[in-house]
Amino acid sequence: MIDTTRYPRLSRIQTPDDLRRFDEAELTAIAEELRSYLIESVGKSGGHFAAGLGVIELTVALHYLYQTPVDQLVWDVGHQTYPHKILTGRRDQIHTVKQKDGVAPFPKREESIYDTFGVGHSSTSISAALGMAIAAQRNGDDRKVVAVIGDGAMTAGMVYEALNHAGGMDPEPNLLVILNDNRMSISEAVGGLTKMLGRASGSRTLNAIREGGKKILGDKKNNPTARFVRRWEEHWKGMFVPSTLFEEMGFHYTGPIDGHDLPSLVGALKTLQTLKGPQLLHVITTKGKGYELAEGDQIGYHAVGPFDPSKGLVAKTGAKKPTYTDVFSDWVCDMAAAEPKLLVITPAMREGSGLVRFSKQYPQRYFDVAIAEQHAVTLAAGMATQGAKPVVAIYSTFLQRGYDQLVHDVAVQQLDVLFAIDRGGVVGPDGATHAGNLDLSFLRCVPHMVVMAPADEAECRQMLSTGVQYQGPAAVRYPRGTGPGAALDASLATLPIGKAQLRHSGTRIALLGFGATVDAAEAVGRELGLTVVNMRFVKPLDKALLLELAKTHDGFVTIEDNVVAGGAGSGVSELLNAEAITMPLLHLGLPDSFQHHASREDLLAEAGIDQAGIRAALLKRWPQLMISLPPALNAATG
């Protein structure tokens, strides 16, 4: 817990109603306290950091001027919402963020009436806010709806679908979009829109035009000279700011203004509250504002573990096991040296996907398409038609956004595209919106796909090489974090397609492990004298091995960190059914529900696919296996 007596104003704020009792002149001091509190809190707990620091003033202004929760705020992505959570009743719990049973890392409707829409993926806020505004209008509710979206999220096509719809509606929706322009997503924002916004925020000429207009106008508002000067200013502003883009889409554009200047923010928002129809306010902010180290390293301080704010992040020393992301990072550089046709695509996840070194060593073969997963996949398809070997490096949860393109543009045409899918399966503290629980199900049903799941780091490297060499679409799906610590070398060796690995020969029951569950399955199998197979391939399955094992075993147990519905285990059932083989089957995997935020270890245990859970499930189905346990385990289990 944090000593709130050091925050005399913030300690009096439990809800936005409390905030609105302060005089407007005190808002700057409140913002300073909120920023300091956030730094202290995230220093203790870890979590998303720099984005929240960048919207302190904006968060204070919005909750001060708008009658939340009657008026509704929709935050895009949600990385920036810790200040919002602090002001809306969760101040004393914010130190539990991302922890099991603690505060959710993103807005979550079940957690608070002030969290009006659940988010986690980018670029959804304008569509959701427009839907709310339309529903309110139809219900006769005179409420205001505000969407807060970053410039990084503005690179996604969904944003322009929503803007296009909102700007052409009759009657006009009561909608305000706030463009939080900090030139960043998680990595640096890229693309043509980013360049245009950058010209707006950094134009000395535009600032000079503004100041000149003020001097000419003085206190005059409506005389002919004033009207002429305003038209002249708007004409020149159109050359430097994106107002034309948004106004042609039907939005009234205001800005850009300094997002850290509370009086300017409050003044602009008060004016916008009096206007009808779709409005867009463009604010310029600095990610990490107020904490010098975060301002200087906005990527490194995007999300942090616990740290001492007086010292900043301290680099870890000593040897450490490579993560699966590290394995991919090394492999892709090695493969690029051996395969000149290799090209790599990422949707704005250079750091997260392990592509920093590749982007520097092979800048002409590296394509960051911004937050545009649909484009990323079809871009890869186009490259493949010309003989290139594209690799799409993407998180499992974000591949969901490019699924139609994977099916329609890649798989139907049987194009040579490799999907390097990070954060597959149980991810952990970021919760349901970032889980990779569905990918084996939605990949294995696609014709022509080869789907692989490595049991260790060395196998991951071999599978990536296999996917590049395969003629057709392939996916390697690997988990967050480290593996068991398998020895690695610089080899680019491949695996035979659809061949499993027998890990342990036993009797009675065969445990069929997929991906990250293999080690736990092997430990239990050796305890109980059972056969253990590292399946390696979710599609195609090793049909010959499975049919042979079916002749000599009394039952199969499939184990995967994917939802059971439609997953790898379902593939085994389908294979046996096609061969008219009837035998006891037990499918262990993730439940038919969205997992909450907690550590990866906690979630695996809850799902019953850690070592203890697998053992318990086996003994429940086949109690006679109890006699195979060592005495100590037998007593503990009994």
From Swiss-Prot:
How are cofactors bound according to the entry's free-text note?
A: Binds 1 Mg(2+) ion per subunit.
Gene Ontology BP, a term: 1-deoxy-D-xylulose 5-phosphate biosynthetic process
Instruction: Say which domain of life the source belongs to.
Output: Bacteria
Cellular component annotations (GO), alphabetically ordered:
cytosol
Tell me one GO molecular function of this protein: magnesium ion binding
- Per the record, what are the reactions this protein catalyses? D-glyceraldehyde 3-phosphate + pyruvate + H(+) = 1-deoxy-D-xylulose 5-phosphate + CO2
Its UniProt pathway annotation is: Metabolic intermediate biosynthesis; 1-deoxy-D-xylulose 5-phosphate biosynthesis; 1-deoxy-D-xylulose 5-phosphate from D-glyceraldehyde 3-phosphate and pyruvate: step 1/1
Record keywords, A-Z? Isoprene biosynthesis, Magnesium, Metal-binding, Thiamine biosynthesis, Thiamine pyrophosphate, Transferase
UniProt-listed Enzyme Commission number(s): 2.2.1.7
| Positions that bind Mg(2+) | 151, 182
Residues annotated for thiamine diphosphate binding in this entry = 79, 120-122, 152-153, 182, 291, 373
- Look up the record and name the cofactor or cofactors this protein needs: Mg(2+); thiamine diphosphate
- What is the enzyme's main class? transferase
Q: How does it assemble?
A: Homodimer.
Regarding protein family, the annotation reads:
Belongs to the transketolase family. DXPS subfamily.
Role of this protein: Catalyzes the acyloin condensation reaction between C atoms 2 and 3 of pyruvate and glyceraldehyde 3-phosphate to yield 1-deoxy-D-xylulose-5-phosphate (DXP).
Q: Which PANTHER family match?
A: 1-D-DEOXYXYLULOSE 5-PHOSPHATE SYNTHASE-RELATED, 1-DEOXY-D-XYLULOSE-5-PHOSPHATE SYNTHASE, CHLOROPLASTIC
Name of this chain's protein: 1-deoxy-D-xylulose-5-phosphate synthase
Q: Lineage of the native species?
A: Bacteria, Pseudomonadati, Pseudomonadota, Gammaproteobacteria, Lysobacterales
Supply the gene name: dxs
